A protein has these predicted regions:
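Extracytoplasmic
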Residues: 178-179, 226, 352-521
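Membrane-interface transmembrane helices that cradle and orient dolichyl/undecaprenyl
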Residues: 106-109, 146-163, 275-289, 334
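Membrane-interface alpha helices of multi-pass inner-membrane proteins
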Residues: 161-179, 183-188, 300-311
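Short hydrophobic alpha-helices at membrane interfaces in multi-pass membrane enzymes
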Residues: 149-171, 200-208, 292-300
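Extracytoplasmic catalytic/substrate-binding loops of multi-pass membrane glycan-assembly enzymes
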Residues: 31-46, 56-71, 81-84, 225, ...
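Transmembrane-helix signature of polytopic, membrane-embedded enzymes
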Residues: 96, 101-124
């Protein structure tokens, strides 16, 4: 018996070690292939800014949560500022997702070889779609971890999970408001259903302790770094809510093809829990309060939330990582059928085939970086900029056939910036420039993108944005604006904001515009 137990334990250690290596390495590999400037460098620069004393909401306008950027600053602090430590951040979270999936499945007594298979396949599809730290992936991981925690709280009756759940939801929400807010609603709803039959003082205590600790940490950070509450309210709540009004339109029309058929493999992967949930409720509605059905409802709710979020986001398709996860739960509950081996084989094959398909179609071709139709072999080692970008394979959709030309243009811009000792603000999607030059870019926005990140004229909260930008120019004594094209979401930051007689525009080369500020009535009003 001892020998058998020892063998199983050693086997488990082997699978866990292999899972860590695979989940970390595969993301690390893809993080170095290709660049989408507007997305690839935003967290790179924000993490560097925080490390050097510039803080979100206070020093730069952001509707993205600060958690991602704070974690990146920590990675830079301990591992140095480089693309390797940047990629290691997202690779670590890919590994965390893989391990938590593995241990959650193991709690259902799924054989460890199957826990390993499903967790590995999920990690292959999770973070490598982008490779580098990205809000949608981080919030998805925090959200999935909160779902796992509630599933385990229901299954194991351990109170510690009730403490963990609000902490994970808090981290998720301050990574990105949605879908974290939707998951919070789902979890509160399922928790209430669970507590109707399983009310315990300990559960309430641990849950409130998690909520209290999260709120205390948030308020402490806000006061310590002197971040105005009004800025947080406007940037992270009010303006995004105004965007939500237009994003809701993206859900229309409500069509079977968009909501179901397009994501059919995800539905099929979860088909066993869906079937059992419907069957049990049909027999007796009050079966809904049974633990097993609450877990099914959690999984179905997660599916609906992720599909809704995918339809409302402007970013690339990424939710196919759910297929191996949901297939694993269908595998677990296949034992309720006589021909369970047939179902098990089906869900294993579905997971393998879908992983290969989506990996080849989206990940390997760097689809989310808009590089699908490009020859990635034309990429250039970005170490020509700096050793900080060593081994990054530089190629973008802006210069698909001549990355060397893009690099040459950017190197010329860097030289122009070096020569200018005036206080400057950089407006660019290539936000690595200030990091390499070890200067403050004095950027007023985490990402320069009208409407999606900050309001346009005539939109709600435009005056808030205008005041924020002009106050920053005055406070930081900015003399000149360096605008580096191409920009995905901006042309001229002053357009519709101040009159043309407040600045001179000098076109230095094909990608660089230098705007020198002049004395004018609008700028004087901020002095």
């Amino acid at each position: 018996m001892k020998t058998k137990t020892s063998f199983i334990q050693n086997q488990s250690y082997f699978y866990i070690s292999l899972l860590i290596i695979i989940s970390f390495s595969i993301n690390q590999y893809y993080a170095f292939i290709g660049v989408l400037p507007v997305d690839s460098f935003s967290t790179f620069n924000a993490g560097y800014d925080i490390l050097n004393g510039s803080y979100p909401f206070k020093d730069f306008w952001t509707i993205k949560g600060p958690v991602l950027d704070i974690i990146q600053a920590i990675y830079f602090k301990f591992f140095g500022v480089s693309w390797f430590s940047y990629a290691a951040h997202s690779s670590s979270f890919n590994t965390i997702f893989a391990l938590t999936t593995y241990f959650t499945l193991k709690k259902f007594d799924l054989e460890i070889k199957y826990c390993f298979i499903y967790s590995t396949l999920a990690s292959i599809l999770m973070y490598p779609t982008y490779g580098i730290p990205f809000t949608d992936h981080h919030v998805s991981i925090f959200s999935m971890l909160s779902i796992y925690a509630l599933i385990l709280a229901i299954k194991t009756n351990k109170n510690i999970y009730w403490f963990i759940i609000p902490v994970l939801l808090f981290l998720g929400f301050f990574t990105k408001q949605t879908p974290a807010a939707y998951f919070a609603i789902l979890i509160v709803f399922i928790s209430i259903l669970y507590l109707i039959k399983n009310i315990k003082k300990e559960i309430i205590f641990f849950g409130l302790a998690g909520v209290s600790m999260s709120i205390f940490c948030f308020i402490s950070l806000v006061f310590f770094y002197k971040i105005p509450f009004n800025s947080i309210l406007t940037q992270y709540f009010l303006f995004p809510m105004s965007l939500g009004e237009t994003r809701l339109e993206w859900l229309l029309p409500f069509e079977f093809q968009r909501f179901v058929f397009r994501h059919k493999l995800i539905y099929i992967a979860l088909s066993i829990p869906i079937f059992l949930l419907v069957k049990n409720i049909y027999k007796n509605f009050f079966n809904l309060f049974e633990k097993e059905n609450l877990i099914f409802l959690l999984l179905v709710g997660s599916l609906i939330i992720f599909i809704t979020h995918q339809l409302m986001t402007i970013n690339g398709l990424f939710i196919f990582f759910l297929i191996p996860v949901f297939a694993a739960f269908s595998h677990i509950y296949s034992d309720k059928f006589k021909n369970k081996s047939l179902f098990i084989n089906f869900f294993l094959i579905l997971s393998f085939v879908s992983t290969i398909y989506y990996h080849q179609k989206y990940i390997d071709k760097r689809d989310t970086l808009i590089l699908r139709n490009l020859d990635l072999n034309k990429s250039v080692n970005a170490s020509v900029f700096s050793e900080k970008l060593k081994n990054l394979k530089w190629i973008t959709h802006h210069y698909p056939n001549s990355p060397e030309k893009e690099i040459e243009n950017l190197l010329n811009v860097i030289q122009e910036i070096k020569k200018d000792n005036r206080n400057k603000m950089l407006v660019t999607d290539y936000q690595f420039i200030s990091v390499l030059l070890k200067i403050n870019d004095n950027s007023a926005a985490r990402i320069w993108w009208r409407h999606h990140i900050y309001p346009e004229p005539e939109e709600k909260h435009f005056e808030d944005w205008k005041n924020f930008l002009l106050n920053k120019i005055y406070r930081d004594k900015i003399d000149v604006i360096y605008t580096i094209h191409p920009l995905e979401g901006e042309k001229n930051i002053f357009e519709g904001l101040i009159e043309n007689d407040c600045y001179n525009s000098n076109y230095i080369n094909e990608i660089l515009v230098v705007q020198e500020l002049k004395e004018c009535k609008e700028l004087k009003s901020f002095k």
